[in-house]
Amino acid sequence: MLNDIQKSILQTVSDMVSIPDGAVNIRLDGQKEFRQNSEHIQIVSKTDKNGIDIRIAPFTKSENVHIPVILSKSGFHDLVYNDFFVGEGADVTIVAGCGIHNCGDCDSEHDGIHTFYIGKNAKVHYIEKHYGEGEGSGKRILNPQTIVYLEEGASIVMDTSQIGGVDDTKRYTKCEANGANSEVQINEKLLTAGDQHAVSEMDVILNGEGSRTRVVSRSVAKEASTQIFYPRVQGNAPCFGHVSCDSIIMGAAKVRSIPEISCNHVDAALMHEAAIGKIAGEQLLKLETLGLTPEEAEEKILEGFLR
């Protein structure tokens, strides 16, 4: 039974107010709190290490998988390995948020390592929200790793966001588009404040003929926080890739964006762009003339930027 704080975190990171249809696995402080399988999706605990295997039957359509994680014990360190086996022709949405509540003096940390094996012509929409809260001096640390292997015609859309309260994060994403006409789309949103620190590293490797990727990273760095981005795309076949990184910097924050594209085939077409800057004064002025305070105008602009 979840307490009120745990329920609030669950809703924040997964939009769950009750148990939804489909497969569900709720992890609380390193233990299985709740599990539900569906006819076409089975969740099984690993026997050799912490984590679960999620097996999605071929041609499963319009089903959801929720696997949220909650940490509510100060000083707790959680390492988990989750493997997803997505059958041919399946079309599913996977929600995998993580929230930490830390009111103590010791650091709390969750390291989630997710590996996807996406079958021929299968489609995956992966949604991941990270959030931290608590008045204690202990840090809230999240270090996710996401590894994806795509077969012919397979695709994944990854919507990942860090919506606040995470003191330290090191994010790593690796996608191998091995099959012909496979596709990777990554939409990353990141917010830091105070003295928080975030590193995001991505490798998208386009091996399949006609494979393609679009990587979009948007971030806001406030106060004295720091962010570093390393989005890398490698084209080893006739393929297309585009990387776009945009950051808003405020106060004494620091942001580094270091995109890299590598073409290893004459018919690989790759491009990147990066922009870092403050909120334009005319944007604030326009909203202030509509009756907003400077603080309200600033928040409205940031909200739209990270939407």
Q: For each of these PLM feature ranges, what is it?
A:
Residues M1-I26:
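C-terminal functional modules
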Residues P20, N25-R27, E33-L285, T289-L292, ...:
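Conserved beta-strand/loop scaffold segments within soluble protein domains that form the structured core
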